[in-house]
């Protein structure tokens, strides 16, 4: 099981902005993170709409983090591009049980517990930590 490519790229884009600590244009972000410009712009639009990234128009335009990297978690980024993380569709409000059951079953209880644990872990990792650990690896 993997996160989507869009979430992977969104995490890279936020990392790029956190690491560089400056306003960057979409083309530079795209090149530095090896993400196509078109896909970068789509993701940046979602990140701006979610309030994680600020965009600026004009000569000195570009993108920068809307708040400090220490206040942006991996969970924030995944939610911005995909919505809430849930291991199984059966956890959604209108999720349909693929076996036709109604109510809560043993599988749903397990999927909910795992989803909550993954969300806690993703919410515990912020981009200041990631940048700091990357700097220690050099």
Regions found by a protein language model. Name each.
Residues 3-5, 9-35, 54:
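N-terminal helix-turn-helix DNA-binding core of bacterial DNA-binding proteins
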Residues 51-66:
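Beta-hairpin "wing" of winged helix-turn-helix
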Residues 31, 48-49:
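Alpha-helical residues within the helix-turn-helix
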Residues 66-138:
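Non-DNA-binding regulatory cores of transcription-related proteins
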Residues 38:
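Key DNA-contact positions within bacterial/archaeal DNA-binding proteins
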Residues 44-45:
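Short, hydrophobic-biased segments on the C-terminal half of alpha helices
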Residues 49-52, 80:
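Residue cluster at the C-terminal edge of the helix-turn-helix DNA-binding motif
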């Amino acid at each position: 099981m993997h996160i989507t490519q869009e979430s992977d790229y969104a995490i890279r884009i936020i990392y790029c902005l956190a690491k560089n600590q400056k306003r960057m244009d979409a083309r530079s972000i795209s090149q530095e993170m090896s993400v196509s410009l078109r896909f970068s712009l789509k993701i940046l639009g979602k990140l701006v709409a979610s309030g994680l990234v600020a965009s600026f128009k004009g000569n000195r335009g570009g993108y920068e983090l809307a708040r400090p990297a220490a206040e942006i978690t991996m969970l924030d980024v995944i939610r911005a591009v995909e919505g809430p993380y849930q291991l199984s569709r059966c956890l959604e409000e209108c999720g349909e049980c693929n076996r036709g059951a109604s109510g809560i079953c043993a599988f749903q209880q397990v999927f909910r517990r795992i989803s909550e644990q993954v969300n806690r872990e993703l919410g515990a990792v912020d981009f200041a930590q990631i940048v700091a650990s990357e700097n220690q690896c050099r």
